[in-house]
């Protein structure tokens, strides 16, 4: 019994010490919280105006006055043929790009035709295949969503009324440089062969013009790409210089003469066109032919 009593007395003593220790910890924690609350409630001195003016950055309101920022209120569309090249065609397109680089992108400082590198548009940076397109219109801006809906519906009606059937579109294998509408980007593209495709392409200009006119677009004639300018962009230039942008027509003349003289690209490129595409912002609507 004495041993049991000794054990119990020892246990009581340790419990007492534990309770006192816990009370002291709680008291310390309470004191710290009280100090923090007092510090938070204390008013800090005001920041001097000189410091505020030194580090203040005013908001850039001018960017909202730029034309591109105001375009967000429009409903966009875009009309084109889509081409999904096969792996064999990919190799031919890559050969065209490499030949262009070899001829016009030498690194000597004396070379007047030195350009920046071109990135292919038919392959992503991860190696996935990407579709190419033949632009039939420029970027279309509608004031209301209803206008865009009318345009796309009239495109359907026009294709049906004209009984458009699938056809093969022939592409020239000799590349040309094309400048973007904003004049800050160069594309390496392949022109659409004009003579063999004249009969198939001509009805689309009328169909698109009527659809734009019925949707309420006044300058619709300026938005349709002419048959002479139809092309497939296969590569894009990375940050070309202003001098290069100014002389891209001269580059085209020189390039055409050299490539035709060497006769490097004797093969023909063509693909089946069985539908037309109209974009709704980032969504593509496919309108198949009859």
From Swiss-Prot:
Q: Name one Pfam family in it.
A: HVSL
Q: Tell me which EC number(s) this protein carries.
A: 4.6.1.-, 3.1.4.-
Annotated signal sequence is: none
Region annotation Disordered: where it falls in the sequence: 1-26
Q: Which domain of life is it from?
A: Eukaryota
Could you list this entry's UniProt keywords, alphabetically sorted. Hydrolase, Lyase, Mitochondrion, Nuclease, Nucleus
Q: Which GO terms describe its cellular component?
A: cytoplasm; mitochondrion; nucleus
Name the phenotypic consequences of knocking out this gene: Lethal.
Q: Does the keyword Electron transport apply?
A: no
> Which GO biological process categories is it annotated with?
U6 snRNA 3'-end processing
The reply to whether Mitochondrion figures as a keyword in the UniProt entry is yes
Please list the residues that bind UMP. Answer: 229-233
Give the misc comment: Present with 486 molecules/cell in log phase SD medium.
Job description of the protein = 3'-5' RNA exonuclease that trims the 3' end of oligo(U) tracts of the pre-U6 small nuclear RNA (snRNA) molecule, leading to the formation of a U6 snRNA 3' end-terminated with a 2',3'-cyclic phosphate. In a second step acts as a cyclic phosphodiesterase that hydrolyzes a U6 snRNA 3' end-terminated with a 2',3'-cyclic phosphate to a U6 snRNA 3'-end-terminated with a 3' phosphate. Participates in the U6 snRNA 3' end processing that prevents U6 snRNA degradation. Could be involved in aerobic respiration.
Protein's UniProt name: U6 snRNA phosphodiesterase 1
Which organism's genome codes for this protein? Saccharomyces cerevisiae (strain ATCC 204508 / S288c)
């Amino acid at each position: 019994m004495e041993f049991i009593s000794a054990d119990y007395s020892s246990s009581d003593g340790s419990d007492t010490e534990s309770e006192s220790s816990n009370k002291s910890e709680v008291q310390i924690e309470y004191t710290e919280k009280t100090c923090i609350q007092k510090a938070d409630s204390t008013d800090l001195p005001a920041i001097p105006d000189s410091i505020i003016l030194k580090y203040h950055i005013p908001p850039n309101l001018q960017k909202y006055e730029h034309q591109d920022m105001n375009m967000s209120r429009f409903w966009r569309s875009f009309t084109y043929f889509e081409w999904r090249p096969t792996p064999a065609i990919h190799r031919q397109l890559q050969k065209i790009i490499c030949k262009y680089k070899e001829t016009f992108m030498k690194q000597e400082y004396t070379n007047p035709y030195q350009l920046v590198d071109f990135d292919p548009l038919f392959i992503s940076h991860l190696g996935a295949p990407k579709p190419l397109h033949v632009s039939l219109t420029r970027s279309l801006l509608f004031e209301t969503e209803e206008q865009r809906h009318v345009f796309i519906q009239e495109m359907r009606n026009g294709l049906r009324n004209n009984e458009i059937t699938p056809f093969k579109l022939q592409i020239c294998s000799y590349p040309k440089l094309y400048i973007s509408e904003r004049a800050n980007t160069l594309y390496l593209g392949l022109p659409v062969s004009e003579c063999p495709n004249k009969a198939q392409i001509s009805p689309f200009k009328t169909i698109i013009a009527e659809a734009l006119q019925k949707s309420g677009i006044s300058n619709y004639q300026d938005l349709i790409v002419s048959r002479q300018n139809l092309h497939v962009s296969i590569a894009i230039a990375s940050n070309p210089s202003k001098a290069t942008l100014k002389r891209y027509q001269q580059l085209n003349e020189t390039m055409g003469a050299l490539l035709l003289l060497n006769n490097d690209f004797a093969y023909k490129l063509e693909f089946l066109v069985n539908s037309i595409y109209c974009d709704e912002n980032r969504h593509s609507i496919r309108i198949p032919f009859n």
